[in-house]
Amino acid sequence: NILLSSTLFVLLMFQIIGSGLGCDMKVRGLDANMKKMILDLPNKKRQIVANGQQSGQPSAPNMKELHWNDEIAANAQRSGETGVFEPTAKSLRKTTKYSYLGENIYKGFYPDPIPKSVNGWYEEVKDVPPAVVKSFSSGGPMFGHYTQMVWANTEPLGCGLVTAFDRNSYLFCQYDPGGNYRSHPIYKQGPPASDCKNGKSSKYPGLCN
């Protein structure tokens, strides 16, 4: 039956084209240890910068400690489960509470995508001119992952993880407020934690609460 054969062919093609990553997911989401790691590693990187321990970068008086946020994490997880490895559309980088979220994404091999992603984003610091700290601009080498990770006012963080059967992991981390605003400072410059509005972090000296 030609009609039946054509219908089956269309259905098969729809399944192949529309399957995306969703049908090939092996692991969804982050366990407790992963959440702890994805929060601790960026805070330690922020701490290095805030304390003036990163060569070529000034210290920061106002860099906040990052905190995990389940609402943002759920939004980041939805982005990962679309099966499309590209920045989430700005219209989808928001929740009922947060109107605009910044984002970093990473693709790598399981089981250690988190340290690789954080270290990879941070390595962009080598391309950041000191002038960009005072006034962000995106021209030249790519360093937007690094600058988002150390954006001073960013505090709540949430990440989503998808691992496919080919062992590729897709990590989406979203931040509030989103950073990388042109002509805005990444952070103020001055003695570490000297401009903390709500006190200093006890866990990460050099950062603010």
Swiss-Prot record:
Region forming the signal peptide: 1-22
Described purpose of this protein according to its UniProt entry: May act as a voltage-gated calcium channel inhibitor.
UniProt superkingdom: Eukaryota
Compartment list: Secreted
Database matches in Pfam families: CAP
GO molecular function: calcium channel regulator activity; toxin activity
Any one Gene Ontology cellular component term annotated for this protein: extracellular region
Post-translational modification: Contains 2 disulfide bonds.
Name of this protein: Scoloptoxin SSD346
Tissue expression pattern: Expressed by the venom gland.
Major localization listed first in the record, in broad terms: secreted
Keywords from the named record: Calcium channel impairing toxin, Disulfide bond, Ion channel impairing toxin, Secreted, Signal, Toxin, Voltage-gated calcium channel impairing toxin
Organism this protein belongs to: Scolopendra dehaani
Family label: Belongs to the CRISP family. Venom allergen 5-like subfamily.
